[in-house]
Amino acid sequence: MLCGDVESCRVWFMSAEHLTRRCEKACTHHSRLVENMFHIMTGKAAALSERVEVLSRRSIREKLLCYFGLQTGGDDCGSFHLPFTLSALADYISADRSAMMRELRKMKEEHLVDIDRGQVTLHHALA
């Protein structure tokens, strides 16, 4: 069920033109709707841009380091929580899960990164 636990709901269909043009009354709720749609679209565009940045790397190691760098804001050392499972991370970087895990093990042995229950810690620059 689309509405979850709600007993009744309403779906409002509207044309794209209705979203992109201001109404004659310049009402606040319409302005807020346009603003919210803009924020959603820019968030999705940023996420797609980051994904392209990661996928443009050749090796699994380069993809992982690029992704980790994006998550830490480019800090030399940093820590963050993976927003998904390691299997989903392999899908995100378009890599075989076992090959990705092998590369993560090598990176851990080289003291580049630690991963514990989804918590990723970087130990030095990712250059």
Q: Model-derived features: where do they sit?
A:
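Phosphate-/nucleic-acid-contacting segments
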Residues: 63, 67-127
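Residue-level signal for short amphipathic helical patches enriched in basic/charged
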Residues: 6, 29, 55, 95-96, ...
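Short alpha-helical segments that sit at the start of domains
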Residues: 47-71
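Basic, amphipathic alpha-helical hairpins
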Residues: 23-30, 48, 71-77
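Residue-level recognition of alpha-helical structural elements
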Residues: 30-34, 53, 78
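Cyclic-nucleotide recognition modules
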Residues: 1-38
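Hydrophobic alpha-helical core bundles mediating ligand binding, dimerization, or RNAP-core interactions
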Residues: 19, 38-49, 64
